[in-house]
Amino acid sequence: TKSMLESWLSETDTLTGKEQLTAILEKNLDCQDAHYLDEVMSGRMKSAEFVLSYMQTCVNQDAALISNTIQQGITDGSLVTDFPDECAEVFLLLMNVWCDPAVFRCDARKLSLRLRFLQHLMKSIGVDVLSDTLLERTLDLLQKLYTEEVHFNE
């Protein structure tokens, strides 16, 4: 069966690589906003075994799909990087683990800085797919999901 990521990619196959990655990030936010990261998921993210398994899935499965999309972006001229595989792996690890307050506890200011750094990093290596709007939506979603754990109101 197709993964959710594969389905999203097939729905956006007429777009440039950059547009595809941006669309996937937006769809992922919409999906999470609707029903993702409930109490069960939040609890799991505190389990070292679950986090390791999640990181391995990011690198061993999801990164290949993202890398292929980056390669497409290189071919169509919308993205420029010499390291599509490594870029995909690092992006997924930082976005899904380092920027997840359930894994690495932080306040809203620190999370905002992490997201801005990730945006800067991706832009500096030629994969400028994190718009300011996307960052704000991500921050808003994470604040909504993790209000208690993260102590955003401090």
Regions picked out by a protein language model, each given a short descriptive name:
Residues D62-M95, C99-C106:
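Hydrophobic alpha-helical bundle segments that form small-molecule/ligand-binding pockets
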Residues T1, I24-N28, C58-D62, I66, ...:
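Hydrophobic/aromatic residues within well-ordered alpha-helical segments
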Residues D33-S78:
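Short secondary-structure transition hinges
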Residues L25-Q32, V40-R44, R116-G126:
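Helix-loop "lid/cap" segments that line or gate small-molecule binding pockets
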Residues K27-Q32, T57, L94-P101, S124, ...:
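Phosphate/oxyanion-binding loops and surfaces in catalytic or ligand/nucleic-acid-binding neighborhoods
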Residues E6-D13, L37-G43, T75, D100-D107:
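Short, flexible helix-adjacent loops and helix caps
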Residues A64, N68-Q71, D107-E154:
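C-terminal peripheral helix-coil segments that are non-catalytic and often amphipathic
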